[in-house]
Amino acid sequence: MQDSILLNQVLLTFTNSFKEHREDLSAVMLTDKKYLWLGSDETSSIERLCWDNHNFAQHKQFRVAEYIDLPAPEEEEIDIEGIDYSGYYLWIVGSHSWKRKKPKPDKSDSKNIKRLTKVESEPNRYILARIPLVDGELQKSCTHPQDSNVQLTASKLEVTQQGNLLMEALADDPHLGFFVKAEIPGKDNGFDIEGITVYQNRIFMGLRGPVLRGWAVMLEIEVESSQTGVLRLKNISEEGRQYKKHFMFLNGLGIRDLCVHGEDLLILAGPTMDLDGPVQLYCLPGGVHLQENVLHSPELVQKIPYGNREDHAEGITLAQDLFGEPSLLVVYDSPAKARLVDDGGVIADIFKLG
């Protein structure tokens, strides 16, 4: 294990209208032709930047509501916590979490204490969706570029009273069901998805929480189309469940993002509670081919720097296409003020990988 080696920094330049949200980036994915796709945990849109003279610019925003039907008005955030690309689809996942109101400096102690009693959830947070992505543009529906007999269609996991089919399936899970039914907020070690990666037909989602006696949890699912625009879960578990659970020892940390590297899984790990760090990068060899009911101990690869109430690493994506050597691009929530450039820019880091 080593400290991170900073190879480079790149400027991400957004339009002025996105100025405030450059400080709450929560998901990132670099696709071919050097498009950078990003999500914020405070919006219901997907952002695209283009590689331009060793930085990312030419910001274009895609409203998710233009591609799939949201269960609530788009003014209510999806809380996008993961983005990935596979098979001409861009995948996004919301946090699937409850949230607790936080104290505000302009309110009295008594009012802030009362705020800490209030927990809520929002229907848009339970979005797991895939949107066709062809030639750098999102589409609601289009013909598969390599097979004219296949139609690509924007779809989401079926919505239910419990949020969606995944939450319905997890409600009786012996490890996670209590957290789901008790409606424990994500930052209180409650159920909270942060990170998605897709390998062939398998979808992996990392849980920031709950962390169970020091063990983090990763979910694996497979989906199928049941009707236009709707996805359902397949039965994939040996026990007949619609999901698999994989337990990871990450030194007591939760999962903050996932990334496929060949057939290995890179895991960005950080605190499940409202803490600055530690933040660490792990590698799980052969992580896309995991058996159930096995405890895994991924290899600690390197530490990721973090700040004092700032610079919280939230998203990772492979970046070797940018500078020609194995590397990882990292974006931060609550970036340090030194990272903010003009009215729309924020600096991301490129770390050496391997």
Which residue stretches match the model-derived regions?
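Sequence/structural signature of beta-propeller domains
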Residues: M1-G354
